[in-house]
């Protein structure tokens, strides 16, 4: 394994991809744990380890499709497992943020995004953003598809649209790949259960929603997403309330209901649903469903049936029912 000292400016390294591989191995050896701890790592080394500025090399290592032009060159240095892929994806995003002029300050469990200098958008490195934006407009849909079953990687990749120079959208929108990104992110929200990934997706939708060049398209996607999520919640609420099967299988229906509420809660808390361009048909039905669930704690628990399940399953049911409430009524 290479030492990070070998990656300092002026030192000879076998190849750019070997250098990226060395950084990944170093990070895994140190065992940072939470990927958020990569923020100070990148912040402190970005000016001294030049490979951290090579976003293209990191992106090429993520694309394992053999049809990728760079595949032959990168094959020997590709991530060996999901842990290396996750580190690479989060490292890439941290480096894009640093290069763009965005600083993340990790304080306890809270992340605050700050802009360098005068903390104004104009202080961002727009030249750097304009450099990587067209590339990711093209490859992000492919990467989303490639890592569709890996939430750890997706939670990093889905942040990239927020970092792109959306002022160039008039040029980028002709790229079918970029135009599909809001739809893909919306589909993730409708199917994923991982909280970190859901929050990252909703933050991206909110960022795209607030930009004049992408807002109209994203608001249409959000409207469709909300209709889909409310319908999903209706179906899963009915499945729970009208459950008539093996009591041991009831927890599965509860978990599905909890997942639907988690998705809705993520959207409601982070996306602007008050926009005039957001109009979903099932808005009234959502209100009725929430009121219905608010008074359904005991009904969801099915106390009269709890003696039919084992101790662990009973505890799991109580836990999930509490989660169902918390997802919509966090103040309680």
PLM regions: where:
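Extended alpha-solenoid helical-repeat scaffolds
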Residues: 1-332
